[in-house]
Amino acid sequence: MLFASDFEDNRVHIDDTHSNQEYYCPYCGAPLVTKKGDIRQHHFAHKQSHVCSDTWANGGSHGYDLSPWHNEWQSLFPKVNQEVKLCLGETKHRADVLVDRTVIEFQHSIMPVKAFDDRNNFYFNLGYKVIWLFDLSDLYSIGQLTYKPINNGLFFTWKNPKKAFNNYDIQSGCI
């Protein structure tokens, strides 16, 4: 997670933290550890074995992506639009990016079909449009994804697309 709350409940980005201050999870209120090493992406983390109330943080419906690919895309948006907390009943989730009434999700890792459906339905039930941006570079490198120029754009062909897209309605943008 890239954002936490300080003692005054202000939203703070990991790169704006100070070592002498405590930061808290915006979902469950638990104290967080700042991870600002030289190897991995800077981020906040719960203390070991803590179970957060953020519905998808604990892998319950697929955990969060901290890949460089994901963070590069997310960082193209203003911080105020990144990792926005959304709630529907007991379900809590942070959208990668929220602009107006549109959620943008960046997906680098493999995602189970149920997790994809759950997230789409969650956003739809809140009245948001969802745009997914998938990292398909691995599929391109093995020939599963091809493209050719057509008119003023590109025509893509995806051999054996994931079954998560079988029930996707292009017109409505819903599952």
Residue map of PLM features:
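Short Cys/His-rich "knuckle" micro-motifs
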Residues: 33-38, 56, 60
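BZIP DNA-binding basic region
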Residues: 28, 34-37, 47-48
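Short beta-strand element of the conserved SAM-dependent methyltransferase core
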Residues: 2-5, 44, 97-99
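Mg2+/Mn2+-dependent nuclease catalytic core
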Residues: 109-140, 144
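Active-site metal-binding core of divalent-cation-utilizing nuclease and nuclease-like domains
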Residues: 13-17, 31-35, 68-118, 145-146, ...
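Acidic-basic catalytic patches of nuclease active cores, encompassing PD-(D/E)XK
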Residues: 1, 17-26, 43-86
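Non-catalytic C-terminal interaction segments of nucleic acid-processing enzymes
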Residues: 1-10, 16-20, 24, 140-175
